[in-house]
């Protein structure tokens, strides 16, 4: 999670990281969809204004290259919204870009602004108890319109490679009776390889793709 406080902290620092809630920080638009939505929840005790900004990125990560999406490629609505305390609403995203075999990634930033910052100066209480502006980054993955889901598992070398053109999650659970919480989860983008000693061992191994759990190791069934 990338969470930034932009000045204007109140003197008593009542801020908590749970003030803005957008659910999972990575969300996807499936290959047969041109629309998705993201729920925004105001967990504060007072009203907030929400705004969205979007940047195209080559690949998520510390060295990602950001650029402005082509005009009309990814649209969203509403332009901004105001939520009262405890209220939730959806931002809608519409993909109008190329219909090809390339996966696309967008960094979607949600900006939360206290509505009192827009009130006349005297009503703000002379600058005391100002609240923070918060920006939370998420990743929107638009799967290729011509999708190829494929992988290569090598239990001898302890590797799993994404040989397709769309991302998936890999869940590795030690042994045959462990819980999901005891497992290790990795995101694999096209071309990525994960190496883990547990892949060589008997255990539960799943690929999570399009909200489906796909078992890639039958060792626990023998």
Feature-to-residue mapping (PLM):
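Sec-dependent signal peptide recognition
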Residues: 1-8
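N-terminal signal peptide c-region/cleavage motif recognized by signal peptidases
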Residues: 12-17
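Beta-sheet-dominated interaction scaffolds and their linkers
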Residues: 18-44, 80, 145-153, 185-188
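Intrinsic-disorder/low-complexity, polar/charged segments enriched in Ser/Thr/Lys/Arg/Asp/Glu/Gln
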Residues: 33-37, 88-90, 135-137, 155-157, ...
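Asparagine-centered strand-capping/turn motif at beta-strand->loop junctions
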Residues: 38-44, 158-166
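Short acidic, flexible loop segments centered on an aromatic residue
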Residues: 45-69, 111, 165-181
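Intrinsically disordered, low-complexity Pro/Gly/Ser/Thr-rich segments with frequent PxxP/GP/PP motifs
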Residues: 65-99, 178-203
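Terminal connector regions
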Residues: 96-147, 202-222
């Amino acid at each position: 999670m990338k969470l930034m406080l932009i000045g204007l902290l109140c003197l008593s620092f009542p801020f908590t990281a749970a003030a803005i809630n957008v659910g999972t920080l990575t969300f996807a638009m499936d290959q047969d969809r041109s629309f998705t939505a993201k729920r925004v929840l105001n967990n504060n005790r007072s009203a907030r204004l929400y705004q969205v900004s979007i940047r195209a990125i080559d690949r998520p990560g510390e060295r990602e290259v950001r650029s402005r999406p082509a005009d009309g490629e990814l649209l969203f609505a509403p332009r901004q919204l105001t939520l009262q305390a405890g209220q939730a609403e959806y931002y809608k995203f519409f993909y109008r870009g190329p219909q090809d075999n390339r996966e696309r990634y967008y960094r979607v930033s949600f900006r939360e602004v206290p509505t009192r910052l827009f009130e006349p100066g005297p009503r703000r209480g002379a600058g005391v108890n100002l609240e923070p502006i918060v920006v939370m980054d998420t990743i929107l993955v638009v799967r290729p319109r011509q999708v190829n889901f494929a992988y290569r598992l090598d239990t001898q070398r302890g590797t799993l490679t994404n040989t397709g053109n769309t991302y998936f999650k890999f869940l590795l659970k030690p042994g045959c009776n462990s819980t999901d919480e005891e497992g290790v989860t990795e995101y694999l983008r096209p071309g990525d390889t994960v190496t883990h000693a547990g892949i060589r061992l008997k255990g539960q191994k799943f690929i999570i793709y399009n909200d489906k759990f796909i078992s890639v190791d039958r060792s626990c069934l023998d």
